[in-house]
C-alpha cells in the first residue's frame, strides 16, 4: 500500500457538469441519455466518449453510473472528463465509497458542486492495482 497516493480527488480525475437536453428536443437514436437516476432515454448524438463514469449532481446525489458506449451526460449529472491515467472501471467502483451525497450544497433541491467534490481528499492505488481490484469486482 506504500505506492498508493493521497491527493485531492480533482488531482486524480476531473468532473464536468452535464448538458441540458429536454425530452421534446431528443431525436430517437441509440445514444443513452444518462441522468442522475440512470438512463432516461436515447438520442442520436453523444456529448461524451466511452468509457464513461457519471454521478448524480441534482436530485439523486452521488449515484454512480458507468457507460461502455458514447453517451449524453444530462444536466443533472457530473461526468468524468479526464481520468488522468486512472482506470475508469476502478473509478466507477471507488466513487461510491466517498459517500458523495454528504456533500450536498442545495437548500431545497439536493445538489453537488464539482468544485467541492474536487477538493475531497482521496487515496488511490497505482494503475496495476486498480486493474486487479476492478477485475475482482467486475
Which role fits each region the language model picked out?
Residues 1-35, 123-134:
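Non-catalytic DNA-recognition/assembly elements of restriction-modification systems
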Amino acid at each position: 500500500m506504500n505506492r498508493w497516493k493521497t491527493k485531492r480527488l480533482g488531482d486524480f480525475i476531473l468532473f464536468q457538469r452535464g448538458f441540458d437536453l429536454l425530452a421534446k428536443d431528443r431525436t430517437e437514436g441509440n445514444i443513452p441519455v444518462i441522468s442522475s437516476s440512470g438512463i432516461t432515454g436515447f438520442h442520436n448524438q453523444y456529448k461524451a466518449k466511452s468509457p464513461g463514469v457519471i454521478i448524480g449532481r441534482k436530485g439523486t446525489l452521488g449515484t454512480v453510473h458507468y457507460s461502455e458506449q458514447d453517451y449524453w451526460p444530462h444536466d443533472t449529472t457530473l461526468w468524468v472528463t479526464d481520468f488522468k491515467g486512472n482506470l475508469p472501471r476502478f473509478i466507477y467502483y471507488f466513487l461510491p465509497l466517498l459517500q458523495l451525497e454528504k456533500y450536498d450544497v442545495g437548500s431545497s433541491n439536493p445538489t453537488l458542486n464539482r468544485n467541492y467534490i474536487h477538493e475531497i481528499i482521496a487515496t488511490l492505488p497505482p494503475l496495476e492495482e486498480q486493474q486487479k481490484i476492478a477485475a475482482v469486482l467486475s
